[in-house]
Amino acid sequence: MASLKDLRNRIASVKATQKITKAMQMVAAAKLRRAQMAAEAARPYAERMDSVLGNIASGVTLSADTPLLLSGTGKDEKHLLLVCTSERGLCGAFNTNIVRAVRERANLLIGQGKDVKFFCVGRKGYDQLRRLYPGQIVELVDLRSVRNLGFVNAHDIAEKIIDRFNKGEFDVCTLFFSHFKSVISQVPTAQQIIPATFEKAEGPSAVYDYEPEESEILADLLPRNVAVQIFRALLENQASFYGSQMSAMDNATRNAGDMIKKQTLIYNRTRQAMITKELIEIISGAEAV
């Protein structure tokens, strides 16, 4: 049975932890508002750029002049999975859910005899994947020193990915991130970014004349589109991280409150039992006299 001192120390420790989780919840809530606004602002641009490029690409006949980012290598043997996770933990199942989606895709591809490699953005995903797939991670991009996430960060990642593609290191690149829906809902999402794939527009499309030629426009814009899609994914991930962290810290704060109540009840009962025992001893001693 724990002593009163042990129980007091335990209660004080949980109260200190509760203060930390409450503070982290408030910080995450403040950062979430900014991150959510950034993610929601990036969505229309990324979707519109994808749509415009899709319209241009629909009128292109694949040939030797077609940009490789659109035509691809013509193979489907080597896959690069671009995995975006967080640099820090204490965010519930945020990273685990993304890695689970990555594992499902990787195991499916490996089962089909494909060569699978990983390009990690964020240390948490890297730490899990390097244990699961040793020797298959080609690069880690660490963003811990980045205070304000900007397009330049996505552009740098895109350049590295495209450079590896041009060197023939992979045939297909799929981007994994967490799509932010709400504070309690973040959906792991997979998006193929190389070679570019576009959804077909519904209904008849207008006919345009382009200057310069479509292939030249695509050659200029497809690399930028890779960066734009990665930037959108990073912003979605950032909002998802803070939403998940806020929920996790809120749950931790509530659990700490429940634990404090439970330990306080045990403390009061133990103290009452000790007082009762002392009274019995005093009365017994008086009767003996």
Swiss-Prot record:
Q: Name one GO biological process term.
A: proton motive force-driven plasma membrane ATP synthesis
Q: How does it sit in the membrane?
A: Peripheral membrane protein
Entry keyword annotation includes DNA repair: no
Q: Is the Transport keyword given for this protein? A: yes
Query: Single GO cellular component annotation?
Result: proton-transporting ATP synthase complex
One Pfam short name: ATP-synt
- Cited InterPro entries: ATP_synth_F1_ATPase_gsu (IPR035968), ATP_synth_F1_gsu (IPR000131), ATP_synth_F1_gsu_CS (IPR023632)
Q: Where in the cell is it found?
A: Cell inner membrane
Q: Which GO terms describe its molecular function?
A: ATP binding; proton-transporting ATP synthase activity, rotational mechanism
Described function: Produces ATP from ADP in the presence of a proton gradient across the membrane. The gamma chain is believed to be important in regulating ATPase activity and the flow of protons through the CF(0) complex.
Which HAMAP family does the entry mention? Answer: ATP_synth_gamma_bact
Quaternary data: F-type ATPases have 2 components, CF(1) - the catalytic core - and CF(0) - the membrane proton channel. CF(1) has five subunits: alpha(3), beta(3), gamma(1), delta(1), epsilon(1). CF(0) has three main subunits: a, b and c.
| Family label | Belongs to the ATPase gamma chain family.
According to UniProt, the name of this protein is ATP synthase gamma chain
